[in-house]
Amino acid sequence: MRLIQPYDLPLEQLQQYLPPLNRPDDFTEFWQQSRTAMAAEPLEASTELVPYPAKGVAVSRVEYRGFQGARIRGWYARPTAGAPHPGLVVYHGYNWNLEGGIHDIVNWALHGYATFGLSVRGQQDSGESVPSPHGHVAGWMTQGILDPAQYYYRGVYLDALRAVDWLARQSEVVTDRIGVVGGSQGGGLSLAVSALAEGVTVAVADYPFLCHFQRAVNLAPAGPYGEINEFLRRNGDPAIESQVFRTLSYFDVMNLAPWIHCPVLVSAGLIDQVTPPSTVFAAYNHIASADKSIRAYRYFGHEPIPRFHGEKLDFLMRHLEP
């Protein structure tokens, strides 16, 4: 049975919802050191052209060295005529299989964008190189969660930054016109990368994940956030709970949002039980960009929103001009 809106806060309250940031004291230093460590690793990229039944588009398999040596893979589709092109990096949802979605990458290329679709480490065919020093529940949300330096999403975020770097190195890409897009986990990554990377021109995030963890864990225990609930059920020590949320605070898109200055478009479904709308608005309302917009859809949950796709295309065209 579908929920009746409002499932979360009413829209009028969501628009004003601005919980305080909970950044650790060394938040800025942590990310400066993390980016420096990533930059010190060689890219070691390779590209292999593969056949694909689409006219006017060339498709390649890409591999590069991610954080701590993980082999990160993805798909690259570019228009075969009219170079140079604006670029897009596409980030996928949690445990989603990009293999079945290559057509989405190709579709962006048919719209005129040189498009790289990243396969997130461990979730598909990209490797995972950071071992967890402790047990974790099924899934990725609690792998290494007791130490920010060992946490799974540290590698994910840094791999995602390197995806922008890889795309900017392609000769057919206009380096000052690169956008990032994605839904759910991919939406969270789009916002995180916009905060942490240099050279992102525009970002679009569909119902972003990884936002306002403290509230998300309370409101969405059945989705991926539920992995954190399950970990805390099995580890009842209050000191462990405190450390879990301290680790998550380094990766909370809400805490990264004040570093976002590029144009941003965000969507939220008001009956979304996976990425509750208040968690999305918490991050959005902290974004520093003067050019930002959010679309709230009253009758949609955690699902593709057809009307937003047109909004997304228009927003990207205005800022990237393919």
Regions found by a protein language model. Name each.
Residues 281-322:
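C-terminal catalytic histidine-bearing segment of alpha/beta-hydrolase fold enzymes
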Residues 172-183:
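Alpha/beta-hydrolase fold nucleophile elbow
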Residues 74, 78, 84-94:
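Short beta-strand element of the alpha/beta-hydrolase
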Residues 99, 105-158:
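Cap/lid segment of the alpha/beta-hydrolase catalytic domain
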Residues 1-57, 322:
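N-terminal targeting or regulatory segments adjacent to alpha/beta-hydrolase or S9 domains
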Residues 270-275, 302-303:
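Acidic catalytic loop of the alpha/beta-hydrolase fold
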Residues 260, 266-268, 272:
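Short beta-strand/loop motif that positions the catalytic acidic residue
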Residues 191-239:
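Hydrolase active-site cap/lid region
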